[in-house]
Design a protein with these regions (language model features):
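Short helix-coil boundary/hinge micro-motifs
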Residues: 1-152, 156-163
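Cysteine-rich micro-motifs
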Residues: 168-177
Length: 177
C-alpha cells in the first residue's frame, strides 16, 4: 500500500522515523508543552501556514472554522492514541475518536493504468485531502510495523511524539535517561 504524503519536516517536527511515521510524529508535535506551551495550529492562519510548509494544504487554500476545529480534534485523537501506545494499553475511546476524525479523508482505493494501487481521497476539497494524507500515513505505518512504535513521552509536561526505536522500553529523545 502506498500513499502520498510529505517527507519534509515542517516547524515543530523532528525526524525520529522516516516516511509515514515521520508525518504522524511531525503533526502530533505541533503542540509543544515544554519548556512553555506552543501550539503551531492555534489559529486558522497558523494552522494553514504549518500545513502549507508540510505540503498537506495547497498554498492558495485556507481552513474554515469548522475545518480548523476538526484539525485540532484530529491532532488530539492522534496524541491520545500515541499515549495509549506508550502505556501499552488499549484505549477504545481514543481509537474511536481517531477513526471518526480520519473519516473526513473519504478514502478510496485507486488503480492506475499499470495496475498500481493507492489510497486517495475521493474529495476534491483541500481539507479532506489533507486528512486523507494523514490517514494514509497511519495505514502505511501500520503496514510497515511502525504504528505501535509511535508513542508520546510520559514525562510530565512533555508529551512529545516520537518513534520508539529502543529495544528495552520507551525512550523519548528529549528525556533519554
Amino acid at each position: 500500500m502506498t500513499g502520498s504524503h510529505p517527507s519534509g519536516t515542517p516547524r515543530g517536527g523532528s525526524n525520529p522515523a522516516s516516511g509515514p511515521a515521520h508525518l504522524i510524529v511531525s503533526f502530533a508535535n505541533t503542540l509543544i508543552l515544554e519548556p512553555e506551551e506552543t501550539d503551531l495550529l492555534r489559529t486558522r492562519e497558523e494552522a494553514a501556514g504549518w500545513l502549507h510548509t508540510a505540503a498537506l494544504l495547497p498554498a492558495e487554500a485556507g481552513l474554515s472554522n469548522s475545518e480548523h476545529a476538526a484539525l485540532l480534534r484530529l491532532r488530539a485523537s492522534i496524541r491520545d492514541v500515541l499515549t495509549a501506545h506508550t502505556e501499552g494499553r488499549e484505549d477504545p475511546g481514543a481509537a474511536a475518536r481517531l477513526t471518526r476524525a480520519l473519516a473526513d479523508g473519504r478514502l478510496v482505493i485507486t488503480v492506475g493504468p499499470a495496475s498500481t494501487v493507492r489510497l486517495a481521497s475521493a474529495a476534491r476539497a483541500s481539507y479532506p485531502s489533507l486528512v486523507a494524507d494523514v490517514a494514509v500515513a497511519v495505514a502505511d505505518s501500520a503496514a510497515a510495523g511502525s504504528w505501535l512504535r509511535l508513542k508520546s513521552c510520559a514525562a510530565p509536561r512533555c508529551g512529545r511524539a516520537f518513534y520508539d526505536s529502543a529495544s528495552s522500553g520507551t525512550r523519548c529523545p528529549a528525556h533519554p535517561a
